[in-house]
C-alpha cells in the first residue's frame, strides 16, 4: 500500500469508506479489510456505525496505532460542548482512546466555524484527536478553517472522481500541503460501466474501478476511500499500485461533463 504524505504525516492512499454500512455487515467489511491489509478506516457519527467499526478494529490482529481511523462530527454537533461531548462518545463507541483524524462533516452556514475549530483544537491538545480536517468544504471555507485553527487542517474530504471536477480545490490543496480525500471515488457505480475506463484497463489487465482509483491516487496529495462489503472488491481496490497511467490516459479519463453520474443529493448540494 502506498501512502500520501502531507504535513509530515504518512496516510494510506486507499482506505475503506463505511457510509451506509451498519451492524454485522459493517463489522465484517472492516474485519475483512483489515485482514487484507487495509490500514485506514473512515466512519462518521452520522453513519450510525461507529460501534461496528470499533468492534472490528478491537478484535483485529492489527495494532491500533497501525490503523489510521477517521470519524466526523455530526451536523448537529457544532458548539463547543457538543463537539467535545460527541467526540468523547465517538471514542467510546469506537473503543479507542483517540482518532487519527476528526473532520467537520459538512459546512453549516448557521454555525460558528471558529467555535467548532476551537473545540477541535482542545481535543488535539488533550490527545483525543491526532489531527483535524474538514469535509465538503470548497476553497473559501477551507482557507477560512486553515486561517483560524491552531492545529493544521490535514485534509478535506470531498466527492471526487473522473466525472466530477475539483481542479481549484486540488490546486489549493497541493500548494498548501492538504490531503484531498476522494469519497464516492467510483461515481456511485458510474465508473464501473465506463467505456474509457474499460479500454484503459484492458491495457493493464485492470478493471474500470481500478483505473478510476489509480487515476485518483496518481494525483498529488490525493487519496481515496472506496466502499465495499465484498472481499473480492476490497482486494481489487487495493491492487492499484502496480501500474501507472500515462499523461494522455490521465487526461482522457477526466470528463467532468459527465457529473450526471453523481447522486441527486450531491448534485443539489455540492460544491459548497
Regions found by a protein language model. Name each.
Residues 1-67, 270-272:
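N-terminal binding-site loop/beta-alpha segment at the start of enzyme catalytic domains
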Residues 5-6, 34-35, 54-66, 88-97, ...:
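Acidic (Asp/Glu)-rich catalytic clusters
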Residues 22-24, 42-52, 76-81, 109-112, ...:
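Acidic-and-aromatic substrate-binding clefts and catalytic sites of carbohydrate-active enzymes
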Amino acid at each position: 500500500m502506498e501512502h500520501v504524505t502531507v504535513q509530515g504525516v504518512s496516510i494510506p492512499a486507499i482506505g475503506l469508506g463505511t457510509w451506509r454500512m451498519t451492524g454485522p455487515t459493517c463489522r465484517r467489511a472492516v474485519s475483512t479489510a483489515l485482514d487484507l491489509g487495509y490500514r485506514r478506516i473512515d466512519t462518521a457519527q452520522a453513519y450510525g456505525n461507529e460501534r461496528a467499526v470499533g468492534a472490528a478494529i478491537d478484535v483485529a490482529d492489527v495494532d491500533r496505532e497501525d490503523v489510521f481511523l477517521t470519524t466526523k462530527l455530526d451536523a448537529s454537533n457544532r458548539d463547543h460542548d457538543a463537539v467535545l461531548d460527541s467526540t468523547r462518545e465517538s471514542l467510546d463507541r469506537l473503543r479507542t482512546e483517540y482518532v487519527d483524524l476528526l473532520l467537520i462533516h459538512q459546512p453549516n452556514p448557521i454555525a460558528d466555524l471558529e467555535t467548532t475549530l476551537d473545540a477541535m483544537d482542545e481535543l488535539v491538545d488533550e490527545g483525543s484527536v491526532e489531527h483535524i480536517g474538514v469535509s465538503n468544504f470548497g476553497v473559501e471555507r477551507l482557507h477560512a478553517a486553515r486561517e483560524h485553527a491552531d492545529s493544521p487542517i490535514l485534509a478535506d474530504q470531498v466527492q471526487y472522481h473522473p466525472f466530477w471536477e475539483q481542479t481549484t480545490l486540488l490546486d489549493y490543496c497541493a500548494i498548501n500541503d492538504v490531503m484531498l480525500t476522494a469519497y464516492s471515488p467510483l461515481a456511485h457505480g458510474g465508473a464501473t460501466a465506463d467505456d474509457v475506463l474499460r479500454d484503459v484497463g484492458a491495457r493493464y489487465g485492470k478493471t474500470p474501478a481500478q483505473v478510476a482509483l489509480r487515476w485518483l491516487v496518481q494525483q498529488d496529495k490525493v487519496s481515496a476511500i472506496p466502499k465495499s462489503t465484498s472481499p473480492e472488491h476490497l482486494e481489487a481496490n487495493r491492487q492499484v499500485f502496480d501500474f501507472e497511467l500515462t499523461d494522455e490516459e490521465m487526461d482522457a479519463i477526466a470528463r467532468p461533463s459527465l457529473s450526471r453520474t453523481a447522486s441527486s443529493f450531491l448534485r443539489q448540494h455540492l460544491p459548497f
